[in-house]
């Protein structure tokens, strides 16, 4: 099932209900457009070198230079473990799993009663990033480069995420009242 786009203001509320570590991971994903697995595999050494560094995407093997904004950067430094910024709870030599972040996000989305018809996952942050980048730059090719997509068609799907979510909801609010 595809992940859905979520209004950034509502996503902010949902992120506030996560554990601090998972909230930080998703905020880094929102700021950089990285997949959650790539965020979780950021090593402490990389962050200690500065706010700008290169990440090798785990899904595609492509290299990508990213910049971490100051607030997120200092939070990453504070929480950084010996090997990874997001350490695994059992083995510090391994990163936190994307499933752990997924589970926490699902719990928070349920807590905030985000519509049952929406599939909110860590990939939602990447879709929000894409929609915001398109609003800022207005060019599909620019967003494609930011997401490191090989095909503009893939990027177009991300850019349509907001409209697809609106169609899916058909006038229903994203947050349900009691």
Identify the meaning behind each predicted range.
Residues 41-74:
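Conserved tyrosine-mediated DNA breakage-rejoining catalytic core shared by Y-recombinases
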Residues 4-32, 36:
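Basic, Lys/Arg- and aromatic-enriched nucleic-acid-binding interface segment
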Residues 16, 103-141, 145:
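Short, basic (Lys/Arg/His-rich) helix/loop patches that form interaction surfaces
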Residues 1, 67-71, 160-178:
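DNA/chromatin major-groove-contacting recognition/catalytic segments
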Residues 25, 37-41, 143:
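Alpha-helix N-cap/helix-start motif at helix boundaries, enriched for small hydrophobics
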Residues 47-50, 139-159:
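Short, polar N-cap/turn motifs at the start of nucleic acid-interacting alpha helices
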Residues 73-104:
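Major-groove DNA-contacting interfaces characterized by cationic-aromatic clusters
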Residues 1-11, 61-70, 82:
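DNA breakage-rejoining catalytic core of tyrosine-based enzymes
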